[in-house]
């Protein structure tokens, strides 16, 4: 089931009809200064199904289809865009609160080469509201808000040049859930227009290469990942407005230099007798968030170390069906960082990301206005770091 | 300033309108007693435990909405979308079988659309928007000896709700600046689905289903805080409440009789609780801030929809070949309108509907070794005639013009059912 998302080519090796059910969750021990911060949707359900295409002859057993789903308990998706100065962890907060639906197909081209493709599905929200006084002086309102489908590709290949060696390559297309709404109202001749745009649940385009060494004693695998975070539009909301007595005004957004990330993973899987499999692994990934943020933003993150362990109980029989149980536990350690702010000198101009401005113009007759008046919650410094603990249990049933 | 809008448009499930899979569409949806496997996920959840092998149904349909208001094209969006069904049976022992499945319908253009049209503007309140939404129906069932089955599940939809949309306008360093934050959620809504199926005689099958009511509610509150000292202070709240895709609670009963071993007659009767359709538009404007325009508000009378009873009749003939089976289908349905006479402020167009259908299918039943399991290919054609009617207003009480409405819907669909 996991192959739909990890590498769809792996579906071609799934063999037989299998149903997977499970649950997973996470707990945050991430800190903003001395305060712990939570994840908004920390738990969800897992569902998966794989089956061979009903083809015989030369195509027998070569094509498998699969479906992987992650289901939140009460929501399909959530789009959160914050004030530019709000301290939060953009890697964790606003990227995991959505239903995931990934159908895929894997094809065994030769006995040593497989390819696969899957689609990552979701929905957005966009449209417009127009209202003005009608002929009866009541409001005539027109609303046209659409929930469009969003689909992005995951493609993969796997090659086994030697009996003991398998290599793989995966591309995951950038994914995000868009939100846009335009409210155009007119009352008593006064326009009240608000145009909002944001995107949530962002995942960058990723390229992953992996290698696995298979022996009777253990399987050792290693992955390297490149993620194009530099294309991230940011976790903020873009606003254009026209309000009574205020006139046209657009929200000012800082230009954040997001960093592309590189990561590496190393995993070991070893059987313990016929019925138990032990697993362990370590991963490291650089942070997409700039380490220096002298201006308005307080985007918290750091290089990430992941330590994982798991156990699988295989070939248990329930009502004559083969069942496999898999349990995993994981700790992600986010390295600590301190962000220090810079205040622009009087008359100095620059992007909001590069420095803070004195918010109150100095008045020689008012001592309270003298010096820098800053309300940014990260001023003069803000500390971050911590851990995220995750775990899950799945049951795979042979149909 | 407070601007509050509340409005509703009504709809039934798009799969109720055109059927789930072309096999069901060819018999006008009279499938409560005969659905098994993937198509049962929508037509009777009990049937997902009646299949032998896992099934995947893939279909696509297109409907030309040739509807008119005042003799002109009513500009109702054509219907097109993909149906996906899945049923996975598990045989526990010789007596008991479990099954799980899901019915999905995905419109091509979007998953859903929230549409609000001024209620005094003539438009098709049911057909304007109702066929244009995604349907998600996960179900599970248990069957005993293939004679009795019970299924349950949910029809899933989402609301669209803003927990917070704030736009702050103020002065920083002597300049006007704005900053915003936003928290929008698509929370899940569920309506229960229950199905019962029985085969009291080798040639007779009966089914009963219940589905709760469902709707998609939009709640967007956009608050702009303005703090420009000496110029203007206060706030502006644009608050939108709209409810779309109201799908009434319904109970369907169906009977199917194999008149001959290869000829089946099926009939369904469905009671739709349209009388619970919520009140329509309620608009108000509360003015504050420094500009002080007057309060604007309106009250619209209750929708007063009436419960309806639909009837569907279908016939299916199967010719079993050596390797390939051929099936021919026909059906008809009568769907009365729940919309009351529009003599007041609202101008909702609708009409009683006559539905005639025809279809056919090929089953590649024994094509080993090319195919290891049978595959079905089905085609269906439907004609929905919406009765023409002339609506005249009570001119003394409500201003407004008379309007006429009616028309036709032509729908065609193809589907394939693959077993694994």
Predicted regions, residues:
Chain A
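Transmembrane beta-strand segments of Gram-negative outer membrane beta-barrel proteins
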Residues: 12-28
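Glycine-rich loop/turn
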Residues: 1
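Outer-membrane beta-barrel porins/channels
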Residues: 16, 44, 50-399
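Surface-exposed strand-loop-strand hairpins of Gram-negative outer-membrane beta-barrel proteins
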Residues: 27-41
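N-terminal periplasmic accessory domains that precede
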Residues: 4-10
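N-terminal beta-strand/beta-hairpin edge segment
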Residues: 34-35, 46-48
């Amino acid at each position: 089931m996991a192959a739909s998302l990890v590498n769809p080519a792996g579906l071609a090796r799934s063999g037989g009809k299998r149903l997977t059910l499970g649950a997973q969750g996470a707990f945050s021990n991430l800190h903003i200064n001395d305060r712990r911060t939570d994840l908004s949707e920390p738990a969800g359900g897992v569902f998966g199904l794989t089956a061979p295409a009903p083809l015989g002859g030369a195509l027998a057993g070569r094509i498998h289809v699969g479906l992987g789903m992650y289901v939140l308990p009460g929501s399909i998706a959530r789009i959160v865009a914050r004030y530019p100065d709000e301290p939060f962890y953009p890697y964790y907060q606003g990227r995991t609160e959505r239903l995931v639906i990934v159908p895929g197909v894997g094809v065994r081209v030769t006995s040593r080469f497989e390819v696969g493709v899957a689609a990552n599905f979701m929905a957005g929200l966009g449209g417009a509201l127009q209202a003005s006084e009608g002929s009866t002086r009541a409001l005539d309102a027109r609303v046209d808000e659409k929930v469009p489908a969003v689909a992005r590709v995951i493609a993969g290949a796997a090659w086994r040049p030697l009996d003991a060696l398998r290599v793989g390559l995966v591309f995951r297309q950038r994914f995000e859930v868009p939100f846009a709404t335009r409210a155009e109202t007119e009352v008593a001749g006064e326009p009240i227009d608000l145009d909002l745009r944001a995107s949530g649940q962002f995942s960058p385009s990723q390229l992953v290469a992996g290698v696995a060494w298979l022996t009777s004693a253990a399987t050792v695998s290693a992955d390297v990942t490149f993620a194009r975070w530099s294309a991230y539009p940011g976790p903020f909301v873009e606003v254009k407005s026209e309000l009574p007595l205020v006139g046209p005004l657009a929200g000012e957004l800082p230009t954040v230099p997001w960093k592309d990330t590189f990561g590496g993973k190393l995993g070991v899987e070893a059987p313990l007798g016929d019925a138990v499999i032990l697993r362990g692994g370590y991963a490291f990934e650089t942070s997409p968030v700039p380490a220096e943020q002298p201006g308005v933003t307080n985007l918290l993150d750091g290089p990430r170390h992941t330590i994982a362990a798991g156990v699988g109980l295989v070939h248990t029989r329930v009502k004559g069906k083969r069942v496999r149980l898999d349990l995993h536990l994981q700790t992600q350690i986010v390295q600590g960082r301190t962000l220090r702010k810079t205040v622009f000198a009087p008359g100095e101009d620059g992007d909001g990301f590069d420095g803070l401005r004195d918010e109150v113009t100095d008045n020689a007759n008012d001592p309270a206005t003298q010096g820098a008046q800053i309300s940014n919650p990260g001023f003069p410094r803000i500390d971050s770091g911590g851990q995220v603990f995750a775990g899950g249990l799945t049951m795979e049933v042979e149909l | 300033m407070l601007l509050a809008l509340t409005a509703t448009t009504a709809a039934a499930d798009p799969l109720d309108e055109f059927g789930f899979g072309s096999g069901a569409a060819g018999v006008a949806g009279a499938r409560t007693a005969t659905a098994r496997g993937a198509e049962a996920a929508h037509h009777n959840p009990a049937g997902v435990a009646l299949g032998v092998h896992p099934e995947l149904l893939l279909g696509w349909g297109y409907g030309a909405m040739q509807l008119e208001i005042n003799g002109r094209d009513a500009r109702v969006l054509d219907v097109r979308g993909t149906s996906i069904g899945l049923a996975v049976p598990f045989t526990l022992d010789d007596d008991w079988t479990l099954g799980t499945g899901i019915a999905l319908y995905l419109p091509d253009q979007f998953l859903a659309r929230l549409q609000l049209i001024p209620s005094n503007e003539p438009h098709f309140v049911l057909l304007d928007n109702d066929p244009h939404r995604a349907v998600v129906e996960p179900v599970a069932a248990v069957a005993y000896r293939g004679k009795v089955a019970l299924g349950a599940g949910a029809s899933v939809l989402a609301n669209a709700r803003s927990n917070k949309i704030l736009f702050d306008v103020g002065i920083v360093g002597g300049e006007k600046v704005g900053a915003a934050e936003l928290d929008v959620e698509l929370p899940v809504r569920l309506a229960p689905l229950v199905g019962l199926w029985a085969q009291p005689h080798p040639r007779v099958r009966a089914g009963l289903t219940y589905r709760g009511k469902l709707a998609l509610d939009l709640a967007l509150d956009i608050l702009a805080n303005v703090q420009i000292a000496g110029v203007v202070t206060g706030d502006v709240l644009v608050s939108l409440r709209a409810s779309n895709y109201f799908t009434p609670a319904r109970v369907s009963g169906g009977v199917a009789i194999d008149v001959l071993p290869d000829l089946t007659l099926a009939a369904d009767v469905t009671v739709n609780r349209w009388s619970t359709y919520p009140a329509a538009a309620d608009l108000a404007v509360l003015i504050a801030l420094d500009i002080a325009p007057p309060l604007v508000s309106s009250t619209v009378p209750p929708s007063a929809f009436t419960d309806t009873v639909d009837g569907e009749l279908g016939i299916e003939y199967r010719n079993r070949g050596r390797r390939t089976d051929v099936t021919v289908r026909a059906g008809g349905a009568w769907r009365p309108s729940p919309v009351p006479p529009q003599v007041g402020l609202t101008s909702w167009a609708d009409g009683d509907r006559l539905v005639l259908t025809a279809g056919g299918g090929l089953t590649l039943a024994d094509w080993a070794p090319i195919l290891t399991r049978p595959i079905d290919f089905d085609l269906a054609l439907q004609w929905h005639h919406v009765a023409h009617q002339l609506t005249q207003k009570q001119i003394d009480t409500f201003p407004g013009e008379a309007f006429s409405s009616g028309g036709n819907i032509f729908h065609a669909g193809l589907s394939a059912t693959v077993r694994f």
